[in-house]
Amino acid sequence: TFTTALTSIALASSVSLANANEISVGGKNFTEQQILATMTTQYLDNLGYDVDSRSGMGSAILRQAQENGQIDLYWEYTGTSLINYNDISESLSPEETYQRVKELDAEKGLTWLEPSEANNTYALAMREAAAEESGIETLSDLADAVNNEQGLTFALNAEFYAREDGWRPLMEAYDFRVGRSEVSRMDTGLVYQALRNEEVDV
């Protein structure tokens, strides 16, 4: 299993709810984030707040919107903040990562609330029949298949492809190389569709 530097998720806020008349809730452009944004919006609405929901934003755009005061709060992944927004690549435990991003983002006027128990970890998937036919059960098996030139094609979301703990470090860790022509970068939802439609192998 390939895990990112951290798997915790927490609400990152730039507003004091006690003093807010209207609260803008942001969300990224994939299903998990849209669900979290909707749940948060409904919860705050039930508490009597006037809520402006703005889900469907790209990760970097959403973060910038919060730093600029356009978004009050959204669910963020501590590993994403550590690596993408604070340029720290050292290996830390989930608790260490949470504490580090909490301190660093506080300097930018952002407050991390208590983390959820949810685990968000990247993984690679194949269609069951194709995996069985190829004898691929682990990332090591996948690396062997690539190195033996089985001609596998991949669909990756843009963030994982570009992350400093994403696609390239994964290839380095398992000692395999996939050419750019074998990798299609697309929105997260389209990744599943491409796999289901047998347009890609992984």
Predicted regions span which residues?
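Bacterial N-terminal signal peptides
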Residues: 3-14
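Extracytoplasmic "Venus flytrap"
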Residues: 22-38, 57-59, 159-162
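Short, polar/charged alpha-helical segment
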Residues: 31-50, 66, 164, 168-172
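A structural preference for short, hydrophobic beta-strand core positions in alpha/beta folds
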Residues: 53-55, 180
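Pocket-flanking alpha-helical
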Residues: 59-90, 97-101, 106, 189-195, ...
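Ligand-binding pocket segment of bilobal, Venus flytrap-like solute-binding proteins
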Residues: 71, 149-202
